[in-house]
């Protein structure tokens, strides 16, 4: 019998997977071509960076083990992997690059053999500060109003169109400028099942003026209804900026503000059809971050030089760069992309297959959203059976363990443990070796 040996690690799990770059000394200039994470690391050393530590520290800890690990086991062969947890931050270059790549690949696999249209909906500049303080409220209303505007005229003709709405919050130079891109294939489905194609911009059931009026009308109606809503929960409370508190406190002032917004122009830009290659459109709206590592030119004398969305060079102090980047943080677990109409999640596969059959085109291969197959047996699916949290605490997923067809014997011991130090030495070393594979 193997004795139970208490393993006293200077146990900080993250040490196993510390990133392979050195911290920069205070007086050392950042390398000419730094990453966004390296710029953040440099800034967070600043004693005045306190407001941003919580937001960006988890980005720096992403994939290092400091956020813990998850244990995955193949439900067919029992292959085991222990993978550092990702941060899932809306501002993490690693997480969002991977999310965007997977989303773009899947959407390209679903493209229909018809022209595609891009429509951009923008909020008035006068709503920018209010939006900054109320992202979840405004973005929810924004999605609802854009979808209502897109559906109104086709709905009147008993036609169901399909479209994707993608929220982007940035303009050039990292300024906060929330707007929505709508990607729509030029085809609709009538209630009798027949297809209705839109080969040109003129053939569409709406134009920019129709879309703008409906967008403005629905948005302001929803915003006003939210203002007068009773018994709202924490996420629904309107946060008024200091310069707008009088509007929030006085009903007459609020109605006057709504009236002023009604008089303003609400921009809608309806583009020409994309005949040749809608892949570029999908790639563009699939972007998740306001800036990528590729846009960073360098850092010198405390300033970041980067290329903006218009391919112009911009120079900002590191502090201003981080502050502008922080403005694009999304509410927790907020989804920036939504599908509507015949492209909604419950209808998409059937609709795409049906349209392709009608048009005589091969059916696209629709990939799984998250690749989770076993790389060893090529047959099983990797299931998360547990978490190893900071400090070695263990949390088990009983449901997935029961789904395993080939269950490793060590799982029974793992189920009884509260912490890695509760495990017998052989199993502890086995798990630590699996963690070390991602060093």
Predicted regions mapped to residue ranges:
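Beta->alpha loop/short-helix hinge microenvironment recognizer with preference
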Residues: 1-439
